[in-house]
Amino acid sequence: MSNTRTISDTKKSELDSTLRIQQQFSIDIASGLFTGAFCSGLFNPYDRALYLSVKCTRSFLSWKNFSSPYQGFSQAVIQRAFLGSVYYIVQGEMKSNLYPYLRNHLGTSESFAQFCIGISAGSVSGILTNSISAIKYHTWGQENRTFFSSVHEMWTLGSSRPFFKGTQATVARDVTFGCTYEILRSLMRNQLPKSNDKKNYKESYLDFVCNSAAAGLATITSGPFNYARTMQYATPPSESPPTIWKALKNVWQESKNQPQKFLGKMRFFQQRFRVGWGTARVAVGMAVGQEIFDVTRSKLTDLYSEQLKTHPKK
């Protein structure tokens, strides 16, 4: 009788654990999609202007970059929400499942655990979002071009090839960014004073600053891969895009033509890799997205816990 009860309790415990994992996954998806939709709408004019400034080699503040700030956005709002959600969803899942295992069972360091979260979130995000990103950037290339017309044009001109261009550069960029971002924000936040009470305004502000700083530095680190990615996306569907090495080699050759050897090169790379406007966009955008995701995730988790207390599962 005792053994039967023990087996029954074990199965119930395993079932409860499975349900909690499934519920947390649903919460992460909902939080991520909400974050992605909000941030994609908020920052779409900035993103489009940044892309056009790199593609057309003109000033970011040029009016031409902002002439149609929401071109193609309404036709692809779901895709944009997905693009902005994947990193946060994978990050949330890794923190719930991978992080405790690495820290509690394997006894790894905090930095290594954050490194694993970053490389997981970055690689999955890069692989899942690249094709949609390629379509999005193609949509931005001309006026009156929609998401679905871009898909048709890309397929007509290059079959499936245009949808996979930029994949390696995207994964390299997102992995570099993810590892740098997760490690730095963890190190910075660990230096902040901790309060036993509920998180106050000052702590939220400091968290935002840490996330912004970490994202800014991660953007600079991953900047060369992002430049190569942009050059690959800017290649017409009927042509083969340059490799990461070729894109970076070309920009290095261009830098040799600068009048001042050191300062001229630094200014040139700053403009090409958009260290400034691009860095500010990712720093603020990532911090805003992280705050929205964390708050939404926390609220939904609390709501689920309250429902369990009110209507416990039998």
How would you label these PLM feature ranges?
Residues 71, 164-165:
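Membrane-interface alpha-helices at helix entry/exit sites of multi-pass transporters
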Residues 81, 85, 171, 175-179, ...:
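Hydrophobic transmembrane alpha-helices of Major Facilitator Superfamily
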